[in-house]
Amino acid sequence: GAFVSLFLEALADGAVTCGLPRDKARRYAAQMVLGTAQLALQSGQHTAAMKDAVCSPGGTTIAGVRALERGGFRSAAMKAVIAAYEKTLALKS
């Protein structure tokens, strides 16, 4: 929950920066995450295939993906999971 909430907040903040009203930005971000999660669960597709299916060559989505990669998004997400796991282990001992 917290990781996805932070991602939703960041998506909405980006949209607000581009001029979208806050209420619409939050709703659109939530709809995007919900729709993608539903597709992942229902289709059984690998998430890489889902990403590739919506990234047109030279398009807007791949530009956004590139920005996420440059910012270390994937690494930060992995580090968050590992940190939470390590904290769980520490609390058990």
Question: Model-predicted segments: where are they?
Answer:
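A short glycine-threonine-serine/GTX helix/turn-capping micro-motif
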Residues: 1-2, 23, 51
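Active-site-proximal catalytic alpha-helix in oxidoreductases
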Residues: 1-16, 27-41, 59
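Gly/Ser/Thr-rich active-site loops/lids in small-molecule metabolic enzymes
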Residues: 8, 22, 79
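Helix N-cap / loop-to-helix initiation motif
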Residues: 21-25, 46
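NAD(P)-dependent Rossmann-like dehydrogenase/reductase catalytic/cofactor-binding core
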Residues: 30-93
